[in-house]
């Protein structure tokens, strides 16, 4: 993202190399002072491309603050007053105050909940409506230092708005697989039960017809 007049209070961090097509040309991003650099990831995000219009010219001022919620709500990070934030598998809630409407890029790096590292790319721009992005939202990456996926959300937001983004980690992602396996087991059991009942009814009908034939 390019530095603009609106972003003079930001510090440059060598934190992002978004792959543009087959090559990586953008190796800079800007974060507001006070954000911890370890929220951002330096090496190339392989096998991922974003449109040209998202590449440059959007380094406007953005202030991101994190809020703490009970883990029981299912939306929880554990955020500390010193600016560090540990994301749980349930999600991340934060508010953003923008100096002007525009596009913002943020990568959040969670390394404390699981041994593996997880990276999330978030696009934020005007009018405050969450939108799906036509790129895969969960894409596995091989040969990189993280072994699960990258979640991508488009959020339209004007300045001084608060919004929620539902981040999902690998432990939560495994739940649908478990549910699918359970569903398959249930379906097979139901089919077996139905077949057994039909067989039993067929035996009863056969015996009944036989008894009628012999006048029992």
Swiss-Prot record:
Record's keyword terms, sorted: Early protein, Glycoprotein
Domain of life from the UniProt record: Viruses
Residue positions with a glycan: 25, 82, 97, 109, 142, 147, 160
Protein name: Early E3 25 kDa glycoprotein
Species in which this protein is naturally found: Canine adenovirus serotype 1 (strain CLL)
Taxonomic lineage from the root: Viruses, Varidnaviria, Bamfordvirae, Preplasmiviricota, Tectiliviricetes
